[in-house]
């Protein structure tokens, strides 16, 4: 058995996009997490670093996201890491890594 659990706290980068799959609501949005700049023990400067994460929310979570989450909202997120591959119109393969949200809390709203 193995577990892939992701816990993030960050800022929403864009308003959720809502679509329906077999009449189930699905929200897609981005979340930025930032490691602050710091100085190492030997004096080396390490710059600030921001990572962007693709979030996917289903059903009730998607409905809540559509109603309450906007760009700039600070979220606490727990979920599973999923990677999928898809092919575009030009038959070019793309790979995307997403967080399938299992639990979240809105820490502040914009």
Whereabouts are the PLM-identified features?
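Single-stranded nucleic acid-binding surfaces, predominantly the OB-fold ssDNA-binding core
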Residues: 1-110
């Amino acid at each position: 058995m193995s577990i892939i659990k992701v816990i993030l706290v960050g800022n929403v980068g864009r308003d959720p996009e809502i679509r329906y799959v077999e009449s189930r609501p699905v929200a897609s949005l981005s979340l930025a997490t930032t490691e602050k700049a710091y100085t190492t023990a030997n004096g080396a400067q390490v710059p600030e670093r921001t990572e962007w994460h693709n979030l996917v929310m289903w059903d009730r979570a998607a409905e809540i996201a559509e109603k309450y989450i906007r760009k700039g909202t600070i979220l606490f997120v727990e979920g599973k890491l999923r990677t999928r591959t898809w092919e575009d119109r030009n038959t070019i393969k793309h790979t995307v890594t997403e967080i399938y949200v299992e639990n979240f809390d809105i820490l502040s709203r914009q």
